[in-house]
């Protein structure tokens, strides 16, 4: 009759080895989870940046390309529809801007709506009656630390409405023809608002070149990490917007 061997427990060394292996696996799991959270956060930040850039450029393009629009061209002309008023020192002028001041340039766009024609203002509203719309885009400080700004729009001199946050700079150039001896209306220069004012080119602006700069959502996440890639603090996006009333496209 065989003798039954007595049961033995784990020795202290075996327990310590098991605990060490468990801690190693747990550490790997926590590192994986932390990495996934960082990745998801970075992807979310990039998606938000793309949405902000797309929305900002769409709002700016919808308004700027409508500059100079007026209904019933058989009755009105640009000169009669948009007389001298405020910053518009020339009859028929539909664009005006400022440059050089922090945190960025500003642009003011004027056009008319006939009512129920689907023409929108910078806040996305349409109108049921004929209205003159003066839209001013600029950056406004949000009062945060560190200081951040938002793209805002003021309609007909009213209080500015915040459109997009996270914008750090707005640079605007205006496409004009400065060579008066050549034929046609081809753009030969992109000038700042100051240069356009000095040359008296506002009535002949055919396009607008926008550069919007946003805070880079990946900049903070890359600090303290060893990487061969330099992560910029900001990201800039550029777009050229044609003024349809000037380039022969019906609005």
Question: Regions from the language model: what does each represent?
Answer:
Residues 9, 39, 45-48, 69, ...:
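Residue-level preference for alpha-helix termini and adjacent loops
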Residues 145-147, 204:
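Short loop/turn segments at connectors of secondary-structure elements within structured domains
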Residues 80-143, 152-154:
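C-terminal globular interaction/adhesion domains in large, modular proteins
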Residues 147-155, 179:
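Short polybasic amphipathic segments
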Residues 2-69:
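Aliphatic-rich helix starts adjacent to a transmembrane/signal segment
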Residues 44, 48, 52-58, 62-67, ...:
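Short linear sequence signals and composition-biased patches located at protein termini or domain-edge surfaces
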